[in-house]
């Protein structure tokens, strides 16, 4: 018997898939075997005496039993002419096949089974086996395997089991037939009862239907009367409604005509509003142009006045310089004559001095000569006097002449001294001392009521003005200051902070050189809009302009809870890449510092632009004629 067949047999016995068999499993599989037979089979298969049959023990024991049977001459399955009994008598099988060995089992044909097959065992002629069971194929395979195993005792036990199982099936079949007969009789009785009930229900339904029809006729008649009355009322009401609708239609026609007229007026008003907006925008641009023209005109007027003052001053300086140059020329002529005479005297005295040179040298080494001391002292005093004289003379008057080598040192010292005096004035933000060299347009921006106008008043008038009116549109102011020794004109454009003037502010940003963005340290909402303002400035300008972020009203920080901290403002300025300063228009703290920082940034940016464009400011060409050149020629 092949191992797969034995494994299948073990799987059939091990219904719970435990991997081993117990005595209870054998009793379930073979309930017709007595305890002695079961114990004998269990002991034969349980080789190690563990009380359970392992799978390997079952396979080995069953295989050894089959081999033992084959060694006794029972190899293969011999199918004999068995007799099958049915109700009509003995019936012989039609197909009789003999298989000599187990190896031919894979190629043997299928067994043809007719209506019912009854196998008659040689060992027990008194038992008829009927294999017409639900699992007929499995039983036949198992029966063939038992026949081929060569264990007659086990085959007899299997035949008893199959016979008892067939007997139980027959009893169950008879019981099922009896129950079917009972069910058929009950069903017939139930059908008769249902027919009687249906007839009764039909009669009752007919009565109820007749009654319902009568009631429905009465109800419909009543409803028809009521509907007729209601229809008459509705007809009269509808006539009234029609008349009212006709009147309303006339009113609506008049109203529609009025609305059409209003629509035409609204369209015309919309066109007029658009034209008004265009005119307002043009007016704003004209105001901007006018303000710029005014600023330029004021700047030109200031430059003109300054030039006139400078021209008159230079005329006075020129006349004074001419007089000074004449006196200096005369003094130099006298000096040259004296120098010539000294040279002649020096030649005549050199011979006399040669004879006494050794004696005079020894005398000079021992004691200094009072004449030399006086000459040295006089030379120092003369140098200081000459230096003061050259400092008093304007440098441009002297520089117009070509100095000779003897006076070049004095001129260099004078230039260096005057340069030192000028360098000492190159610090801070001071009032202008002359015409403006440069002009910068600076736009004041920020939310409403943050102190922009007060900031401008502090810059222009050096005072705090309380209760200033709100700025409408833009206010224009000009302040000329001296920054690091340079006169600079600052045009301050004070814009309105309301949202409705935001588009007007953008037009000023396009022409601005710099911007001062002001927020109120006591109003956090104005600080939160700083980023939007900076983005608006950057979007409106064609190039990057210097911006300073100013936190105003720091004098009120201590009295205001939740004020914006200085570190927050500095962080915002660093993140946006702008300057930062906290100020107070009330006490004027850091106002000048903020303007100084922004002005220096504007000047630095303009210097870079001038260098990048290749513009070089050369000094004026020097005059080729002068008193020194004439003196040298003479």
From Swiss-Prot:
The source's superkingdom equals Eukaryota
Q: Identify the main location.
A: cytoplasm
List every stretch annotated Disordered: 216-237, 308-328
Protein residues bound to Ca(2+)? 46, 48, 50, 52, 57
Domain (EF-hand): residue spans on this chain:
5-33, 33-68
Q: What keywords are assigned to this protein? A: Calcium, Coiled coil, Cytoplasm, GTP-binding, Metal-binding, Nucleotide-binding, Repeat
Identify a single GO molecular function assigned to this protein.
Answer: calcium ion binding
Q: Matching InterPro entries, A to Z? A: EF-hand-dom_pair, EF_Hand_1_Ca_BS, EF_hand_dom, P-loop_NTPase, Rab, Small_GTP-bd, Small_GTPase
Quote the record's binding site residues for GTP: 449-454, 552-555, 585-586
Residue spans making up a coiled coil are 169-310
Compartmental location? Cytoplasm, Perinuclear region
Provide one Gene Ontology biological process annotation.
vesicle-mediated transport
Pfam families in alphabetical order: EF-hand_7, Ras
Propeptide, residue positions? 632-634
GO CC list:
perinuclear region of cytoplasm
Subunit-structure text = Homodimer.
Described function: Binds GTP and GDP. Plays a role in uterine seam cell development.
Its name, as the record gives it, is Ras and EF-hand domain-containing protein homolog
- Species for this entry: Caenorhabditis briggsae
